[in-house]
Structures are given as C-alpha cells and as structure tokens.
Amino acid sequence: MEIMLVDKHNFTRDSLKDFQRYQEVKNVYRLHDGKMILVYNPFTEDWDATRRLQKAEDILSGKYVTYCAFEENCVVGEIMLIPQLNKGRLIIDSFHVSTDYRRRGIGRSLLEAVRQEALKRGAHALYASCCSSEETINFYSAMGFRLSSDPISSYVEDEPYDLQMECIICVLN
C-alpha cells in the first residue's frame, strides 16, 4: 500500500470505479447537553457508480489537496483537504477507506499524510464534520480528535447530525 498526493498522473475519472463506499450503521452518536450519547439509528451508506464518478471529479477539480492510498494501482482510500486555513485549521472535506481494506491501518496512514500537509501549510489543527456513526466517531476519537470548541456554523447548518471534531497537531506559539 502506498499513500500518494493525487495528481493527473496517478488519478483519473475512472480511479474510483471499483471503490466500495459501503457501511451498515447501527448506532450513531447524538449530542445531548454537550455530551455524546449513543443511540440506535440504523441506515446504510452506499455509493453507486454516479456517486463514485462525482467524487473522482471533485478530486480532479483542483479545489482540494487529496491523498489516496493505492494498492496495486487501485485506489483503496482517499482523504481530501480544503487548502485554505479556517482559524488556523485545515478542513477534511472527505475521508473514506474502501470496505474490504478497512482495519488495516490505511485510514491512520492517510490521516498522518494530511497531518504532515497541515503542518507544512502552517495549520495548528485538523477539522472534520464527521458522520455520527459509532464506527466513524470511534475512529476519529482514537486518532486524537475531540469535539470542536469552535464549530464552523455552515457545517453545523448543512449537516446537523454530524459531529464537529478537531485534532490539535502542534502547539500554538
């Protein structure tokens, strides 16, 4: 497995053709009085071919700094950053690992790549509007993310059930 910064030489519109964005969710976290409470709320997340093509076009748009995990020239994970700082934070816009490749350290490796990118760009934290599924929040928490004390209002409004999380990556001067 190799983590690479995406460019036109290693990524095309067809690069996500076989990507499996599938997740069966049973439990989600909800905020209640400032605390995360786990509640039963089953749903399934699944990308069809149209959604995968749209994601590939987003990656190729030039609006994001994107790292992908490649296994035998196939994309098995992606993480997209909005390159402009927001109050000293870089925002993770998208972060997924293909279903069959989860629990292999790929997400951790992708996150480390964007931590290094954030440091190069002078950020002190990473910010993410996270799907509230138990698995997703447990992963982000294990990676050092905590509920943001300064959530970005547009993300809260657009995704009211997402949890706004951030991870400090260096000490402020």
Model-identified regions with their sequence ranges:
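Acetyl-CoA-dependent GNAT
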Residues: 7-12, 18-89, 93, 98-99, ...
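Structural motif
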Residues: 121, 142-143
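C-terminal "cap" of GNAT-fold acetyltransferases
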Residues: 129-133, 143, 150-173
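Extreme N-terminal starter segment of soluble prokaryotic enzymes
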Residues: 1-4
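Helix-turn-helix
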Residues: 136
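A generic structural signal for beta-strand entry/edge sites
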Residues: 87-89, 125, 162
